[in-house]
Structures are given as C-alpha cells and as structure tokens.
Amino acid sequence: RREHDDPLAICLLKRYAADVDLASGAPYLPDCRPATGKKVAIIGAGPAGLAAAWHLLQFGHACTIYDRNDKPGGNLQYAVPLDKLPRDILNAEIRQIEKLGATFNLNHPVQDQSSFENLRKTYDAVLIAAGKIQPAQLQIWKLPAAEPGIRANPQTGQTEVPGVFAAGSAVRELKMAVRAEADGKTAAYAIDQYLTGQTITGNAANTSAIVGC
C-alpha cells in the first residue's frame, strides 16, 4: 500500500473493529462444541490463563480460573498504564470469557500442597498460568523446575506430572502479553488433546507467537 500513499496502521484497525464490536450490545461470541463433561482448573487469570480458557471453553471443556487477586487480568489489570489499556475495555473482554462459560474463583491463591493436590483430584487437567513462580513454590507443589520456571515441554506446556500443564511466564519470562496469550492457546490445544486421548502436539503449527492467534 505504501507504493500508492501511506501504510495502514493494522493494529489500530483491529482495535477499532474490536471497540465497535464491544459497543454493539451483542459482542461476538464463538460457537462451542457440545460439553464434554471434562473440567479444567486454571491457576492464574492473566493473559495466558484467560486465553487458555477462551479456547478450552470452545472445545466444550468446563473451566474454573483461580487467582489470588480480586480482579482477573493479571498484569493487564494491575500493571499496564490506563492510557495504554482502559480498564473498561479489558473488563468487557473478560466478561466475554465469562459469558462463554468460565467460572472465576478470585481472592483464592493456590499455595499449599494440599490445595494443589485437591485441584488435581477434582479436575481432569490443571493449567498453571500464574506468572513467574518462585522455586520454593514449585517445591511445595512438587513440580520439576527449570530456570526460570516450571520444566515443561516447550511445544505443548505439558509437565512431567500427569494432567498438569504450564504456560506463559510460569515457564519462561515473557514481557509481551501477546506472547503469553499465544502460550495459553497452545496449552489449551494440548490439554484438549490430552483430555480426548489424542497425541499431544499443542498447536504450534497454527499459533503465531507474534499475534497470538
């Protein structure tokens, strides 16, 4: 396009389309597969956890998101400047995930071993997407560590503990939310494959770490 006049600001066009959709009164919600009866616990309501829930719900799996804070969003809620990300927009996007079927269990840190094991017993899979986790916490959860986070398959997020997956900064330091979201989507595909008895490959072929989709 620049050969004709000026380049287009693609990201601003996407933002405009999203803003118009949210303001429409009936924002877009994707179709979901029939309920599978499978349940997934997600520890962390930041970008990776929210993205994972968005896709897992479309696969028909029930999702409960646990977070230590009183509002979901992670660093998007508590660290990004308001002029960069208005909170009414963020919270409207999160409500879409809730409308899709996600359950939020806020002010609910999962810290001790018994709480973590209870999630493993109650749910068919657990995704850890709680941001950077200290080595001492991994010892409490009895999860293998690898600098700078949980040791997990880089293509799928699968850990050495059956049914436990990890994504985002829980595995490696990620400074861009879009990369955490891409991680969450990949983990969601891997968890779906795990729950449906498929070979676990993640979604690397279809997920861009640059655009998160």
Protein language model regions, located:
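Local cysteine-cluster metal-coordination motifs and their immediate loop/turn environment
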Residues: 1-5
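Short, hinge-like loop/turn segments at secondary-structure boundaries
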Residues: 81-85, 123, 145-146
